[in-house]
Every structure is written in C-alpha cells, then in structure tokens.
Amino acid sequence: MSITIQNLNKHFGNFHALKNINLNVPTGKLVSLLGPSGCGKTTLLRIIAGLENADGGKILFDGQDVTAKHVRERKVGFVFQHYALFRHMNVFDNVAFGLTVLPKSERPSKGQIRAKVEELLKLVQLSHLAKSYPHQLSGGQRQRIALARALAVEPKLLLLDEPFGALDAKVRKELRTWLRDIHHNLGVTSILVTHDQEEALEVSDEIVVMNHGKIEQTGSAEAIYRKPENAFVTEFLGETDAFEGRIEKGFWHYNGFAWKLDAQYKWQEQTATGYIRPHEWQIAAEHETPMICAEIEKVHAVGALTHILVKHGKQDVHITLAGSDAARYPIAEGKELNLIPKQVYVFSQNELIEYSI
C-alpha cells in the first residue's frame, strides 16, 4: 500500500508541530522518519495511524483519502518502544489476540488462528517460547513477539515507533538486521520512527530527515549520507568538524587550501563553512598543500581503525584512518600531521542560520 501525505499541518496550542508536510511512501518500502526529539516524527506517525488528527492537509492510502477515517478502518499494525504485551497471556495468546477480537464475520477459525500464530512464531524464530509469559522473555524476544502480534492481522501498513529504543546496543544491532530481513520477506509497507542515525541508515529503503516540524531531505540512505542538502542534515547524520572559510571563483578556500565546488551550483563569493567527517581525512603527500597542519593529542586503535584527535589552533579535529593507512605514518602523540580532506560539504552562512540545530 502506498502512502501520500499532502500539505499536512498540526498545531498544539501555539506550537506548530508539523509544517506543510508533503511525502510519498511507495508500496512495499521501509521508510524511516529520522530526526531529533521534538522534530515532529512521532506526531506524523500518529496522524498516519489515525491516533491523532491533523489541522489541515490530506492522507491517502493507495490514492484513497483516509484523513477522516478511524484508526480501526486503516488496517495498520503498530510496534512501540514499550512492547505492550499482555502480562497475563502467554506468547501464543499474545500473538493471537488481534485475530480473536476481530468481528465475527472477519474472524478466522480456531484452526486458522493456530496455523497463523505458528507461522508467525516460526518467522520471528521463537516457536519454542509459545507457552512462555512476557516476564520470562528478554527485551529482544518481547519486541519480536510484539512484531509478530502486529503482523497477525495482516496489516497493509506497519508503523514502528522507536521499537528498539529500550534495548541495549548489541541487541539493537541484531534486531535491526532481523527487521530488515523480515521486511524483505514480507514486503509490507513500513514506516519507522527513530532518532538513531545508524539504525535509519542500516534498515531503510528511504530516509526522511525532519527538524522543527519540517522535512529537510528525503532520499535513499546512500543519497542522504553522501549528498546532504543542508547543514542540519550534514551535522545530524554523524560526527563532523566545521571550518569557516570563504567561497571565491568556484572554490572554497581555507588556510591556503582550495576545494573545488560543484560547478552546477552558482556559488556567490561569501563566507561559508566546510564540514568534514572523521573518515574523510587523509594524510597529505609531500607535493600537496595541506588544509591543516595539526599536532596529535590522542591515538586510539579500535580493531581495523585508528582514531586520532589532533589540535588545530584551539580546535579539536577528529580523524579516523584505516589501520593499514595509519601504519604507513609515524602516528604518535606529539607528532604533527599534514592533512587534506577527501570530501568537504560546504554551506553558506544563511543556510547555517536557517538550519541550526
């Protein structure tokens, strides 16, 4: 089922929570709403579900206007951060619950319900826990059961509101991979709310980055990461260091270093800030003009990566090198490094003001 949102607005008193939201979610895709707390992502999810009413705009499911339809008529499945399993029911009965309370005309037979629950427990790899109760399960197992319960009624749309937020990092990572596989197998249109950049980048077909009730950028995980459209998206999608330079004659200049800008944009001569991610630095060759010359303050090797903190004037700059690259150079505290970037994301001062976090 495809989702189309047109000019959606929502106020809470004087607070404008959603501002003219326009969004298309293609059939069968897993789309993440990504942004900081208070950006409007959960409000948007609740309006799509029918749990909250919009002040203006439309919501279309497969081209049909459902803006005024009750949540029960939207055929939506939910998975929340807090599993909301029934403590007095075992795993089997929790998964079966949605089927047992359907109107009699729509309710499957007991045999069909049993077959469906067994199928779903096999899908989430927890068949052996059918007779267990929620308090006997780990957090990851409870969340798998919550997803199985949501899928039991065969929703046309699956909504997930920070489903892994209450779990520890290792379990979250395992469940992200598992969710991606489940979605690939079932193909149900899904919308995931998260503030976790890594989670969104790992599981999503498309990402919708939100801030202050607006959509900042929509695209594939790779496009969002590789081609951020503004300073907010650049900063929000991972660690960066910022350098204030100047645009002149199609180049961004900083400290004698020049970075050629994309010719398709008409860059005006102005002050502009360049953002560089830790892994997008490299050590300058002898014939290259470095962007910065900095003293190493700390070195920390983690597996195949070497994390380096350098001091550039009063600014701390974070560098991440592959272990093989770091081994070719005298990387040690107190040594100096000449560094050039492999990629610089440049934004004007006006953009920085408009998209400040």
UniProtKB/Swiss-Prot annotation:
This is Sulfate/thiosulfate import ATP-binding protein CysA. CDD domains: ABC_CysA_sulfate_importer. It is a peripheral membrane protein. One of its GO terms (cellular component) is ATP-binding cassette (ABC) transporter complex. It comes from Neisseria meningitidis serogroup A / serotype 4A (strain DSM 15465 / Z2491). It is found in: Cell inner membrane. ATP binds at residues 35-42. GO terms for molecular function: ABC-type sulfate transporter activity; ABC-type thiosulfate transporter activity; ATP binding; ATP hydrolysis activity.
